[in-house]
Structure formats: C-alpha cells, structure tokens
Design a protein with these regions (language model features):
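Alpha/beta-hydrolase fold nucleophile elbow
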Residues: 100-105
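Conserved alpha/beta-hydrolase
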Residues: 43-74
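Active-site glycine-rich loops that stabilize anionic/oxyanionic intermediates
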Residues: 25-28, 33-39
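Conserved acidic functional residues
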Residues: 36, 62, 88
Length: 105
C-alpha cells in the first residue's frame, strides 16, 4: 500500500499536511476523509487502511491550526471553522481532482 505525504495549499495558500494512501492495484475511487472538529488525521488511519484494502484511495489531512498543519506556535494564529469549510476542504478536493482526474470522489 503506497503512502505519500503532501503539503496541499489551501485556497488562500496556507499549507495543509496530508497523507495519501493508494492500493497496489488501480483504485475504484478516492475518499477525502474530512476529520471531525480538530480531530487529527492519524485518528482515521485504520479507516483509511480499510478503504485501501478494498481498492479505494484515501486522503487523510489536518485542518489548518491542527496536527501537522499547525504553525510552531498558535499564539496569534487565527483559524476559524469557516476557514476549514471554505478554504481547506475545497483545496483538498481540488488536489484529489488533479491527482485522480478520472476517479469518482
């Protein structure tokens, strides 16, 4: 199961940490795993491995300000849930569209 790490630019350019897991054969589709409120991407590792074992690619990622998408210090850092939904989620989907243009999302 190939796994790669990525820095996906959000729609405003903020870098988002992501892990892309792909089955050994051709994937049927790709799943964007949007975590629960401030839940780190690693929490969904077992789910992603299950998807890959069933021929789906999976993208795990951290919202801005959380996990590996957090700056070294959160002092003075501003991230709103609105940013997660309007700037972060669509950028990850764009990345998946570019990476897997012919697969369902």
């Amino acid at each position: 199961m190939p796994e790669t790490t990525h820095r996906i630019p959000a729609l405003d350019g903020y870098p988002l940490a992501a892990r892309l897991l792909v089955p050994d054969g051709a994937p049927k589709a790709v799943v964007q795993v949007n975590g629960g409120t401030a839940i780190l991407k690693e929490f969904y590792g077992s789910f992603a491995r299950f998807l890959v074992q069933n021929s789906y690619a999976a993208c795990l990622w951290d919202y801005r300000g959380t996990g590996e998408s957090a700056p070294a210090s959160l002092r003075g850092f501003s991230a709103r849930m609105l940013d997660w939904g309007t700037l972060d989620m669509p950028a990850v989907l764009d990345f998946l569209e570019e990476t897997f243009p012919d697969l369902p999302k």
